[in-house]
Amino acid sequence: MKSVIDHIVVGAAHLDEGCAFIEETCGVTVPFGGIHEQFSTHNCLMQVGQERYFEIIAANPDAPSLNRPRWFSLDDEGTKRRLVGGPIALCWVVGVPDIQAVIDKSPVPLGTPLSLYRGDLQWKLTVPDDGHLPEAGLVPAFIEWPDGVNPSSRMPALGVTLDRLCLTHPEPQWLEDVFGTLDIEHLADITGGKRSISFACDTPKGKVLLR
C-alpha cells in the first residue's frame, strides 16, 4: 500500500474563527466534527477528495487542563503568536499501513505512536512528547487507521478539493531526501525558501491557496 495524504490541518486560535475564515476564503461552512478528550481540542471536518479530508482544529476552552502539551504545536508560544494573526495552514498527515515501521526508518524523530479516539473512531498517530510539529509541520504526522480506511466518507463533500500541497524549506534537497526515505516524495511539491506550508485547493470561490 502506497502512503497517501490522509488529511490537511488548519489551526485556529478559536474554532469559530477558523470556520469563519474558511467560509470567507472558500465559500463553504465546515460542520463541527467533535472533541478530542485526550488533547483538549475540538475540530470541524469536510472531505477534500477521495479518502482525504480537511480539519480545522483549535484548543477547546471548555476542556480540562492537560498533563502534557497539546498536539500539533497548539501550546507552542510561537504557534500561539501566529494564530493571533488568524488561522494558518498548520500541518499535514499521511496515512500508512504500519506506523511503527515508518517511525523505525525515519531520519527525523516523529514521536510516539499514540492510540487515540474521538467518539467511535480509533486510530494511531505520531505525536512528539512535547507536542511540536517536526520541521514546523513540513514533515508530516503519520496516521494508521484500523483496516487502513479513514473516515472521510462520513464527512460532507462541500465542493472543496486539495489540488497540491506546497512546502518551502531552506534546505529543499535535505527535505526531499527525508521524504525519499519515508516513501512520501510523491505527495508534496518542495521548493527552497523560508519554512512554510500551503494547501492549493479548488473551491466554490475558485482556486485558493491556504497558508
Short names for language-model regions:
Residues M1-I5, V10-T29, V48-R211:
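Glyoxalase I/VOC metalloenzyme domain signal
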Residues T29-H36:
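Conserved catalytic-core motifs of GNAT/GCN5-like acyltransferases
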Residues H36-F39, T191:
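A short beta-turn/loop motif at secondary-structure boundaries
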Residues Q38-E51:
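N-terminal low-complexity or amphipathic/hydrophobic leaders
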